[in-house]
Amino acid sequence: MGLVTTKEMFEKAYNGGYAIGAFNVNNMEIVQGIMEAATKNNAPVILQVSAGARKYANPVYLKKLVESAIECNKKSGTDIPVVLHLDHGPDFETCKDCIDTGFTSVMIDGSKYDFETNVALTKRVVEYAHPRGVVVEAEIGKLAGIEDDVNVKEDDAMYTNPDEAEEFVKRTGCDSLAIAIGTSHGAYKFKGEPRLRYDILEEVSKRLPGFPIVLHGASSVPQEFVKMCNEYGGNIPGAKGVPEEMLRKAASMAVCKINIDSDIRLAMTANIVCPVLTGWIFRQFWCIIINVSTKEMCLKAVRMRITAVHGVLS
């Protein structure tokens, strides 16, 4: 099957009332863990590359890793839909580079700009991407929190306006839209009880029937990973994610893509600091043990999210 776009994937998800998990990747172990988890669940998956991952591991390198994982799947007799996606593309040039590299989906994040500038920037990316068979995700509204180069203070966060969302999609021709309904980037999603603005989501979906909505900052922040990190020198008290039942409800209301990054980072951190600090890594084997165990922990984190929101292929 090779790499695909989100077009058919989102159409099936929308009609089926489920969402596709989009997981951030930046090395071989994460790619292996995500692909193995998706394959075991026979589920479609989106592998996405952030600005930080582009700096750390060249996008060409990451594309080859993903293609190799797909090829390994084919040789083992399994074949699932896989999308390679640019997460939070900051400008036209970055999106163009990823499109030219062979990504099948890109996100242009113009949410930091005023409405008209965001429209113009997104439309420019769409006009370049569509003739090349690439789909475009855009964003309107601002999520609080930090993710790589994306840093929005809580006071600057802004819920999505449904009127603007409708106009934005019609004027830009984007293929999916990330909206702000109360989630945030990072491991601290909520100060008090978790609350999402389903009323905004419902209104947007009414104005844009059949159109796929994206939910950023949707990690559930498993407490077992938080506990492991804190027990071995970490300091992330009170970390709180989006409960799985909230994700399932969002998936039943037009959300077709749910972004997961913090869960992967927590899984990796927990699995590295625990064996290192408890002393059961022998010096000559530490690289092998960390690489294998990191993949397994990423696999576990991804399967938890897939169970919550993914559709299972027939």
Regions found by a protein language model. Name each.
Residues I20-N24, L84-H85, M107, I213-L215, ...:
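Short catalytic-loop micro-motif centered on adjacent basic/acidic residues
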Residues V309-L313:
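Short, intrinsically disordered C-terminal tails of secreted or membrane-associated proteins
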